[in-house]
Each structure stands twice: as structure tokens, then as C-alpha cells.
Regions:
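Charged catalytic and DNA/RNA-contacting regions of genome-maintenance
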Residues: 2-332, 337, 341-345
Length: 347
């Protein structure tokens, strides 16, 4: 990048903000448009199929530019995030009319990633959008799984093999790891979007403090996760990641629970694939098991069904309890219709 003094004032501001978010595509608000420049413009053009144009940059000549009207943000943002991009939204922080010929003050107001997304346009309501975090310590590993949109927060700790199995059960949209293991993680999990985070976020004391603050407690004993330090480190790191992406004060994230290794049937990625539980081996034309089973009346029900298929329980009493509920509704069609109606009315 050339010296900032060679840029026009607007692009000088753009590159200054971009330098603070080098790993994100920066959507920079200019009047009624969101614009990208230089390498980000090329990326935006390729992902969205937009025409790549150029903006004058004073002594440096022209630089690549691409953009779209601000009112189209809800249309294009999901496409960018689903393509695996981290997107920083840079808005005008003051009324341009009051700037009085000065450069309008701008700043990043929100960062969205594959694992941190909100709203109907961004999410598939029938599926959890998991953000996962991993902390390694020799042969052992701690994991955390967070759906920021619903507040569902799960942790686990055990062998690396066990955690690997969990990853393919949860199928997270994004995986956060310590920066020093990022390259190794990319090689090990090529199918996941992997984000590096500074090591301090995984330090036990800092992570525990972040997690307690988010949950509004002084101790984690009430959640029965305090004896699993690597899991707590992963969970705390995810809270730090939320803060770094300008997502603070999420009151729906108020509880956390541990996944008990001995309570479920564990299936590896090959089992999920061979049984076609979530994806058909015939591609988009085929039908998976969840496609056949999912007749749920609400997105919440669909998410729960997928969770049950991901983590089949071993407890016979719990299984029989589920069967009893199914039998009740099979024998009482009027009650079934009433329940369906009530659930749908709440959506």
C-alpha cells in the first residue's frame, strides 16, 4: 500500500479503517451507497457478479471500485457472508450536511461472519448457525458451540478424537482457534471456515471472566462447567470474539450447558455422510433423512429435530418418554391439531 499522504482524503480514511480490519471485506458508506476499493472491490465484484469500476485517487491515479445502493444491503450481505467472508460495515457517524466541507466521520458499526449472523435474511431458520471455538492442550481439547441468534451455548471437553466427532455433529459455520494453531487447523479441517483469534482470549482467567460477565454470574459452578477449563477457555474466547465484532449486550446468551460424552451415540463424518442424515449423496436432487422427517410446525422444532439427529441419546427412559409423547399425539388427533395451531400462531 502506498503512503497515506498520496491518497485522496476519502480513500485515506478508507485505507485507515481498512487497516484496522485487514481480514474483513469493508463496506464503506458513501452517501447512498456502500462501496469497496482496491482488493476488496475485486472480491465484491467476483462474489456478487458486479461490474468493477474505478475511482480517482489523486496522484496515485485510479483505484478499483465496486458498490451497491445502501437499501440493497439486506440483499447482498447474506450472499457475502454465506460465501465465507467476514464483512465489516462502515457507516457515516454524522450527518453529511453538518460536516461543512469536512470529511464525514465514519466508523465500523458491525462485523458479520459466517458464524455471527442475525435476522431472517441472513439465516436458515430451520438450522442452528453454530459458531465454534477450540482450545488444545496436548491430547485433550475443549470446545464451545454458540448459536448467537438463539442464545444456545454448549461446551465439551475430552480427547481430540471426541471433539472432532462433535465438530461433524454440529457442523459449525465458523471455527475460532488460537492464532498459533490457525494454519494447522486449516489443514486439518479444510471444510470449515476457520478464524484466528489472539492467544490472550483463550487464557483461562481472562476467558472465565468474559464468560461470567456474559452470563451475569460470579461463578460457573451453577452451570456444572467449572471443572472443564479447556471448554471454559473456548467459551470465553467466543464471547471475546463477539465483542470484537461489535456484538455486545446479547441478553439471549444467558445460560450454558455441557455435552456429556457418555449420553449420546457418536457418529463420525463418514457415518453422517453414508447414512445421508443431513445431505443426500445424490446432491441437490436427492433427499436426506432430515428432509423426510422434518414436518415441524416451527423453525425451533426443526432445529431441535436436527439436534436430536446429530446427537442421538442413549438413555432408554428419555427415549421412551419421547415415544410416549409421540404415541399420545398419534392417539389424539384433535390435540395434535390444536398444538400445531398454537405453535404456528407464535411464529
Amino acid at each position: 500500500m502506498a503512503k497515506a499522504s498520496e491518497d485522496t482524503p476519502l480513500l485515506r480514511q478508507y485505507f485507515s479503517i481498512k487497516a484496522q480490519h485487514p481480514d474483513a471485506l469493508l463496506l464503506y458508506r458513501v452517501g447512498d451507497f456502500y462501496e469497496c476499493y482496491s482488493a476488496d472491490a475485486v472480491t465484491l465484484s467476483k462474489v456478487l457478479g458486479m461490474v468493477l469500476t474505478r475511482r480517482n485517487n489523486g496522484e496515485k491515479g485510479d483505484t478499483e471500485m465496486a458498490g451497491f445502493p445502501h437499501h440493497a444491503l439486506d440483499t447482498y450481505l447474506p450472499k457475502l457472508v454465506r460465501s465465507g467472508l467476514k464483512v465489516a460495515i462502515c457507516d457515516q457517524l454524522e450527518d453529511p450536511k453538518l460536516a461543512q466541507n469536512k470529511l464525514v466521520k465514519r466508523g465500523v458499526t458491525e462485523i458479520l461472519t459466517p458464524g455471527i449472523a442475525f435476522g431472517e435474511t441472513m439465516l436458515e431458520g430451520k438450522e442452528h448457525n453454530w459458531l465454534a471455538g477450540l482450545t488444545y492442550d496436548g491430547p485433550e481439547c475443549g470446545a464451545a458451540f454458540l448459536d448467537a441468534s438463539t442464545g444456545t451455548f454448549r461446551v465439551a471437553q475430552g480427547s481430540v478424537e471426541y471433539i472432532n466427532t462433535l465438530l461433524y455433529s454440529f457442523r459449525p459455520s465458523e471455527l475460532v482457534v488460537q492464532r498459533d494453531v490457525w494454519r494447522t487447523a486449516r489443514e486439518k479441517y479444510p471444510e470449515f471456515c476457520i478464524t484466528p483469534l489472539d492467544e490472550w482470549a483463550f487464557v483461562p482467567d481472562a476467558a472465565r471472566e468474559k464468560l461470567c460477565s456474559q452470563l451475569g454470574v460470579s461463578s460457573l459452578k451453577g452451570f456444572a462447567v467449572d471443572r472443564y477449563p479447556l471448554a471454559v477457555c473456548s467459551a470465553g474466547a467466543l464471547v471475546s470474539y463477539l465483542e470484537q465484532t461489535h456484538h455486545t449486550g446479547l441478553r439471549n446468551i444467558c445460560s450454558i450447558s455441557r455435552i456429556d460424552e457418555g449420553s449420546f451415540v457418536w457418529m463420525d463424518r463418514f457415518t453422517f455422510r453414508n447414512l445421508e442424515i443431513f445431505q443426500s449423496n445424490s446432491g441437490t436432487e436427492g433427499t436426506s433423512l432430515v428432509d423426510v422427517l422434518d414436518r415441524c410446525s416451527s423453525p425451533m422444532g426443526s432445529r431441535l429435530l436436527r439436534e436430536w439427529l446429530s446427537l442421538p441419546i442413549l438413555d432408554i427412559r428419555a427415549l421412551n418418554s419421547r415415544y410416549d409423547v409421540v404415541q399420545f399425539f398419534c392417539d389424539n388427533e384433535e390435540a395434535l391439531d390444536e398444538m400445531r395451531s398454537r405453535i404456528r400462531s407464535e411464529e
